[in-house]
Regions:
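Functional-site microenvironments in short loops/helix caps that host divalent-cation chemistry
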Residues: 32, 97-238, 246-249
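Sec-dependent N-terminal signal peptides
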Residues: 6-14
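Hydrophobic alpha-helical membrane context
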Residues: 16-17, 205
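Extended beta-strand/loop cores of jelly-roll/beta-sandwich
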Residues: 2-3, 17-134, 141, 242-261
Length: 261
């Protein structure tokens, strides 16, 4: 009887700890359990290990970013230095603190035309950071029902279809976007997203001296590898990131935040 009661007590403590852990999860963030994945070219690549981390459920919206620039004037359209954001910064906004006549249509949509510098500043002011390329790609492998949908051709076909479409006049609200296994919305089919180390996107081996991947991607053998749907989709993202500079602002490039645990 004593042992039975002790077992129940231990079980109850475990449940309470689990509930407490769930309660302490930051609002609108989810836990992405760590693991390994193979970027780009399947067996030709070195597996990358990703630690468990937290990630925002949604990309940052125009309304959220408006609150940020209201609090931090240095990131307003008229005040930001060109070193930190080019001339297209917040291009669709009507002014420093106005989303314009279409505010109702875009307030809950992803903020775009933001630079890496401004995205990084936003996340840091929330006590967070941008996700690394490795974390973002790992989380983006998830379909609606699988943490790793690397072998699901239909899942990757959806990505290709999105990449082939022109930008819509108005991006949809973030809550109406595709929701994956982790509960993350819009990882595919909404906007491109800034990552912490975007400028190292083309180097995926364990050593930064490993430059063979660059040749694979952009030379003859790269085109052969891209015939695999999932490789082509990842290639599109890596190629896009490699074209960016930290002060660039692009019409379909937004961001979300992450956090180490």
């Amino acid at each position: 009887m004593i042992f039975h009661r002790l077992f129940l007590l231990i079980l109850l403590v475990g449940v309470c700890c689990n509930v407490q852990a769930q309660k302490s999860l930051p609002k609108n963030m989810v836990n992405v359990k760590g693991g390994t994945f193979v970027p780009l070219y399947g067996s030709d690549s070195i597996p990358v290990k990703v630690k468990t981390f937290l990630m925002d459920v949604y990309p940052v919206t125009n309304a959220e970013y408006l609150a940020f620039v209201n609090k931090y004037p240095k990131w307003r359209k008229s005040a930001v230095k060109k070193l930190f954001a080019d001339e297209n910064y917040l291009k669709k906004w009507d002014g420093d603190l106005s989303l314009g006549p279409n505010a109702a249509k875009i307030q809950n949509s992803p903020v775009v035309n933001v630079s890496w510098f401004s995205a990084k500043a936003y996340c840091e002011c929330q006590g967070k950071r941008l996700a690394t390329v490795e974390e973002w790609e790992y989380a983006a492998l998830a379909s609606e029902t699988k943490a790793n949908a690397a072998n699901d051709a239909k899942f990757y076909q959806r990505s290709i279809e999105w990449y082939s479409k022109p930008n819509p006049a108005y991006l949809p609200p973030v809550k109406e976007s595709f929701r994956n296994y982790y509960g993350l919305h819009g990882m595919i089919g909404l906007v491109w997203e800034w990552t912490q180390n975007f400028n190292s996107a083309m180097v995926v081996g364990e050593s930064r001296a490993d430059v063979t991947m660059d040749r694979q991607l952009f030379c003859g053998s790269g085109s052969d590898g891209a015939k695999d749907v999932k490789n082509y989709v990842a290639f599109m993202r890596y190629a896009f990131r490699s074209s960016l500079k930290a002060n660039y602002t692009v019409a379909n490039l937004g961001f979300r935040c992450a956090k180490s645990i």
